């Protein structure tokens, strides 16, 4: 709440670039500024100083003069908040996913195409179109909500703790879906997460926040091996890397592994 006794600075001197086509993760302890940074990237709030731009278009206060450019830039960023299934409200899966494209003023034929495509992207069967979203499982409802964002055809997909509350199977399906979107659709993904394991598995670059400042940026494996940075951000390395370090100390070189299965396969190969 700006200009009130409750106001405080959430981010300090943050300067960074989210590269197109890259899978970027943002991590930090509670209160580090992750959610504020996410809202700035999506144009939901304005910085008190500095600028946020999407593909070279500054996201500022909308005026009649800049409305079209600003609107176009905002549509390039799709936002998925924590527990997005809580935002479902239409009577059918189809109508919920179609809500965004219709509000973009698209013809109904294009709305139909986008709904079908986004359902395929999140692995929702087309027979679900006329079902109530509230009759689906928790994981299916979340995928329906994400499909509604994908139907807007964003260039950048920003997700805040997208796997929160999911069971192991739902978590695996969601992370696999994000990896497929990134790999096969060249979609730029920004993942805000408390799970260092998810970040190690999925992200190409990690931005580390502490006390509202960027304290590290680089390949997740490099960041996680930097104990000084992790201590500064009050985080711990993924269990897999800590396990790998212990295994290397007893004579098995495991190198860089993103999953337990990769590590197991590597150890087995060294024994042959």
PLM region spans:
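Conserved ABC ATPase signature
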Residues: 132-136, 140
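Catalytic Walker B motif of ABC-type/P-loop ATPase nucleotide-binding domains
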Residues: 157-160
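Conserved catalytic motifs of ABC-family nucleotide-binding domains
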Residues: 153
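Conserved ABC transporter NBD signature motif
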Residues: 50-61, 73
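Conserved ABC ATPase "signature" region
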Residues: 109-127
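The feature captures the beta-strand-to-loop junction immediately N-terminal to the Walker
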Residues: 27-29
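ABC ATPase C-loop
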Residues: 149-150
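Helix-to-loop junction immediately C-terminal to a conserved catalytic motif
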Residues: 42
